[in-house]
């Protein structure tokens, strides 16, 4: 595309504000289509991120040319379609208040989307007709979500509709993928995450296949507990036959997942969880593999995600074996012969003989009664786990006892598994009054509160409160695929508020991950997030009542989430002073004591925060994912929408300030695959600040996780990044995380060669843990 027009356009754009007349540009195309211009500008991103910005604006302009110019018209055109997905009630609300909605919506805000963002919106979130033609703009989608939240009940709350639209369209907050593409439709399944517990009887085994398939078809991600299924070759008294164990059942769920895709928009997404004492643990650990005997015999199930539910007892035995203090003996059981091991947990970690350790007590009781069906060592299990992690990045590790002992809902029942991305932890069970866990997710853009004089913690608190009310309304307005999901959600009313853009905050404030000030700020940010959510949930309880399972909860006793960590010995009692100092008095000891007293009177939601992956939100807004460091300073992001070059704009701005963003530096950055650690022309201070997630010591990620985890009601999707697959390195951070009381041991463990050995732009598909994991991505 070597024309005067394109070269002039490129030179005008480079490093400038991009005040481009898109109508004039479109008329001047002559022989080139808008799509060709978009592709060309995107390819020039390596020179400057402004090229990507222009490509995004061209893409938005292209969409605007083919869609309705007002919100009500867009809705009218969709409603007129023979196979319209829109709910008649939603359409009626839009028609009734169309003057307000049409005048308030601001289509110019579409031009704030990144290229990755607008293309993701086109591909996944914007409603289409039966022929696949896009029928709305991003602003229409934001308004549709806002109306779904505040306009579908008994009262149409115009004020809150407009406020929510404003927060969404300015990218201060985001709602989860199912909410985005199902809001306003005839079957509004708005929830992201579902947790199922599979019982050991044929009827329930197949019921869970059906239930998971129905949930997946509506866009939900699923976590299944398999720990209660009897092991292979166990006797079945009813039939006189032997059990097939978990292997065939996992393969059945694997096939179901592949068939039941998420509304045709993306593949289905299931995670299966198992406890380490289960006799079939070694089979379970081999099933995700793409290579090896089971894979060659097609006895694997590689489309599923896998998770281990790890008790303290196993970690203690493993640590003793590592340090030659014990032989690592670990007993294996079949749950039909050793029942309820997955239904109990250790309330304390103490080794004192009177400590409340129900799991440990029952485990050794079954050992004494010789109910075990096999004996191995803790090291053998962890080695087998590691072989699989090297290939596929999981099984995840969830610390069972930490999750349960720090749960506000520990009085409800034992948490036996998590969800697709190991950040949601809700009790679930089958049988009488079955409950299937459900959680609605949203996230706050931390970068939205960066100010010239520091960080706006008050703004973050307010935004967290707004999201809390949004999610609470979604609980009442959403569609539930089963009565057990409705029962659980109405009883506990759990929500999961996450974050994205933490790395953007640190880069803007010139902090580096791992520094004392960064760790303190990480703690303070998540304290503010939790505080804002709890404060608003208390206010909502006064207006609408507490969640039915509130009596007996930790909050009903005046215990906040960080108090549970103090009680367990994993957080110092001085945390309030640290937060007060970091927030410069926005949150004081008095603030927290007032919150405790108010919480005892009632709380609307059983859970408040959960730190999920946020790949889609990050794509849309140009911010870094969740709480993670930058994975690279230059990479190609693979999504369902295609491949897009992403450049770290903060690094570019810092280099421009010192006149170092030159062609030579650009080429070195490209040759190094996005790393600047060996570009010695760049000052050491900048190189240190822009270490990527893989280049920094992984203990830094653990320490940051330990700082924020006390303010997380549920858990977090904690990734680790390593150059080489060395078990000792991985065990170091896992044991450190366990000792610090983390609830998640690991989400994905990524391994790859050093960036300096790569001569092409990093193809960073790992950044989002694969596109099929997006059910709980935002």
Swiss-Prot record:
It is an enzyme of class 1 (oxidoreductase). The record marks 200, 230 as: Allosteric effector binding. The keyword Translocase does not apply. GO terms for molecular function: ATP binding; ribonucleoside-diphosphate reductase activity, thioredoxin disulfide as acceptor. Keywords: Allosteric enzyme, ATP-binding, Deoxyribonucleotide synthesis, Disulfide bond, Early protein, Nucleotide-binding, Oxidoreductase. Belongs to the ribonucleoside diphosphate reductase large chain family. This is Ribonucleoside-diphosphate reductase large subunit. The lineage of its organism: Viruses, Varidnaviria, Bamfordvirae, Nucleocytoviricota, Pokkesviricetes.
């Amino acid at each position: 595309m070597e024309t005067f027009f394109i070269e002039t356009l490129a030179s005008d754009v480079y490093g400038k504000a991009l005040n481009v007349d898109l109508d004039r540009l479109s008329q001047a195309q002559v022989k080139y289509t808008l799509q060709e211009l978009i592709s060309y500008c995107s390819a020039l991103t390596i020179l400057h991120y402004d090229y990507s910005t222009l490509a995004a604006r061209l893409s938005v302009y292209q969409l605007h040319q083919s869609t309705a110019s007002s919100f009500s018209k867009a809705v009218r055109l969709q409603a007129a379609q023979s196979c319209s997905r829109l709910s008649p009630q939603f359409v009626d609300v839009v028609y009734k208040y169309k003057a307000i909605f049409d005048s308030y919506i601001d289509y110019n805000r579409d031009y704030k989307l990144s290229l990755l963002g607008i293309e993701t919106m086109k591909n996944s979130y914007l409603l289409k007709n039966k022929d696949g033609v896009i029928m709305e703009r991003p602003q229409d989608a934001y308004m549709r979500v806002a109306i779904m939240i505040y306009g579908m009940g008994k009262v149409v709350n115009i004020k809150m509709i407009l406020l929510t639209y404003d927060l969404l369209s300015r990218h201060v907050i985001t709602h989860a993928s199912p909410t985005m593409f199902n809001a306003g439709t005839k079957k509004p399944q708005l929830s992201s995450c579902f947790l199922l517990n599979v019982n050991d009887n044929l009827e329930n085994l197949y019921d869970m296949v059906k239930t998971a398939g129905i949930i997946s078809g509506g866009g939900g991600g699923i976590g299944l507990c398999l720990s209660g299924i009897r092991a292979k070759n166990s006797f079945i008294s009813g039939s006189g036959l032997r059990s097939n164990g978990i292997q065939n059942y996992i393969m059945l769920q694997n096939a179901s997942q592949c068939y039941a895709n998420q509304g045709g928009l993306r593949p289905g997404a299931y995670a299966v969880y198992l406890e380490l004492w289960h006799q079939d643990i070694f089979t379970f650990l081999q099933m995700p593999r793409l290579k090896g005997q089971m894979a060659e015999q097609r006895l694997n199930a590689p489309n599923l995600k896998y998770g281990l539910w790890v008790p303290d007892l196993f970690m203690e035995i493993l640590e003793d074996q590592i340090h030659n203090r014990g032989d690592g003996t670990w007993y294996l059981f079949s749950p039909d012969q050793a029942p309820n091991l997955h239904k109990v947990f250790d309330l304390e970690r103490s080794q004192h003989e009177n400590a409340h350790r129900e799991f440990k007590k029952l485990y050794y009781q079954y050992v004494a009664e010789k109910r075990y069906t096999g004996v191995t060592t803790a090291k053998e299990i962890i080695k087998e786990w590691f072989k699989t992690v090297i290939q596929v990045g999981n099984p995840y590790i969830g610390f069972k006892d930490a999750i349960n002992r720090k749960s506000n809902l520990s009085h409800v029942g034992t948490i036996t598994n998590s969800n697709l991305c190991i950040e949601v932890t809700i009790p679930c069970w089958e049988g009488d009054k079955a409950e299937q866990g459900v959680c609605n997710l949203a996230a706050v853009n931390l970068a939205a509160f960066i100010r010239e004089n520091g960080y706006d913690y008050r703004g973050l608190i307010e935004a967290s409160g707004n999201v809390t009310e949004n999610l609470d309304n979604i609980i009442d307005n959403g569609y539930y695929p089963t009565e057990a999901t409705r029962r659980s959600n109405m009883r506990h009313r759990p929500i999961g508020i996450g974050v994205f853009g933490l790395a953007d905050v640190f880069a803007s404030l010139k902090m580096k991950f791992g520094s004392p000030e960064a760790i303190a700020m990480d703690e303070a940010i998540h304290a503010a997030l939790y505080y804002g959510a709890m404060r608003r949930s208390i206010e909502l309880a006064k207006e609408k009542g507490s969640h039915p399972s509130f009596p007996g909860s930790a909050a009903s006793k005046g215990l906040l989430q960080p108090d549970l960590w103090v009680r367990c010995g994993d957080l110092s009692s001085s945390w309030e002073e640290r937060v007060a100092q970091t927030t410069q008095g926005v949150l004081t000891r008095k603030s927290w004591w007032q919150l405790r007293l108010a919480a005892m009177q009632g709380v609307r939601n059983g859970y408040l925060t959960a730190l999920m992956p946020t790949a889609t939100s990050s794509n849309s807004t140009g911010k870094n994912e969740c709480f993670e460091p930058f994975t690279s300073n230059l990479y190609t992001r693979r999504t369902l929408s295609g491949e897009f070059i992403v450049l770290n704009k903060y690094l570019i701005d810092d280099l421009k300030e010192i006149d170092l963003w030159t062609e030579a530096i650009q080429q070195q950055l490209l040759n190094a695959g996005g790393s600047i650690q060996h570009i010695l022309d760049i000052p050491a201070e900048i190189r240190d600040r822009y270490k990527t997630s893989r280049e920094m010591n992984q203990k830094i990620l653990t320490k940051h996780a330990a700082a924020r985890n006390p303010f997380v009601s549920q858990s977090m999707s904690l990734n680790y990044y390593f150059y080489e697959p060395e078990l000792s390195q991985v065990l170091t951070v896992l044991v450190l995380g366990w000792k610090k009381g983390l609830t998640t041991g690991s989400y994905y463990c990524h391994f790859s060669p050093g960036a300096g050995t790569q001569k092409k732009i990093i193809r960073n598909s790992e950044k989002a843990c694969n596109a099929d994991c997006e059910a709980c991505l935002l």
